[in-house]
Amino acid sequence: MARLILLRHGQSAWNLENRFTGWTDVDLSPAGEAEALAAARLIRDEGLDFSVCHTSMLTRAIRTLHLVQHELDRLWTPVRKHWRLNERHYGALQGLDKRETAARHGEDQVFVWRRSYDVPPPVIAPDDPKHPVHDPRYADVPPDVLPCGESLEATVARVLPYWYDAIAPDLMAGRDVLVAAHGNSLRALVMHLDGLDREAVSRLDIPTGLPRLYELDAALRPVSYRYLGDPAEAEERARAVAAQGRLEKN
């Protein structure tokens, strides 16, 4: 039976500041580093291991993975980095404070941008310096496939080819796999694995720094899945993710 561990990166500096991050490359906060180390201990306490790792091209996910590997003495484990595992691209919203954006545009509009399935955020133009076409890490990616702002639907369409081309073959070959990625790229994988419809995945919240363990049958269908550690903590962290972008109630 194949095992797959999905791990959202630890809290980033912009998670802490409640900003839309997307493809902006920010590092972990000190709390995020602690979350990554705690995730490693949860994996160790369960007696789990992994023989190959996948992550995005963004520092917060890469550093989370490296902290886990170091804590478990697994820095030698092969790592494959790919842009298709990057976070959803939030277009012109990237860098903006979520609550300030809700105050300016309305909480309902921000909710639609964040949580709807097929509505993209305001996009950025290809000549914008923040467009990924200007980032050397994507120099080998055809410019016409680099996003300027994505809906969750577009993120799913971007992520799933990597599942079929890279992650699934590793699992089918009998390798236990760790994927360290982002809230929305992991939502795309969970949608596929769990057979969620668009309404269900729009309500799904992935907490930072908590490993989600899948046991998969020979056809890569989930036999079981759960968050490692305290279920109440997973629920609390997921609620915190859901609350981002809501205005304070007086």
UniProtKB/Swiss-Prot annotation:
Query: Quick one: which gene encodes this?
Result: gpmA
Q: Which GO terms describe its molecular function?
A: phosphoglycerate mutase activity
Question: SMART domains this protein is in?
Answer: PGAM
Q: Which PANTHER family match?
A: PHOSPHOGLYCERATE MUTASE
Site feature Transition state stabilizer, where: H182
Quote the protein name from its UniProt record.
Answer: 2,3-bisphosphoglycerate-dependent phosphoglycerate mutase
The keyword Repeat appears for this protein: no
Question: What is the native source organism of this protein?
Answer: Nitratidesulfovibrio vulgaris (strain DP4)
Q: In which pathway does it act?
A: Carbohydrate degradation; glycolysis; pyruvate from D-glyceraldehyde 3-phosphate: step 3/5
Catalytic residues (positions): H9, E87
Record-annotated residues binding substrate?
A: 8-15, 21-22, 60, 87-90, 98, 114-115, 183-184
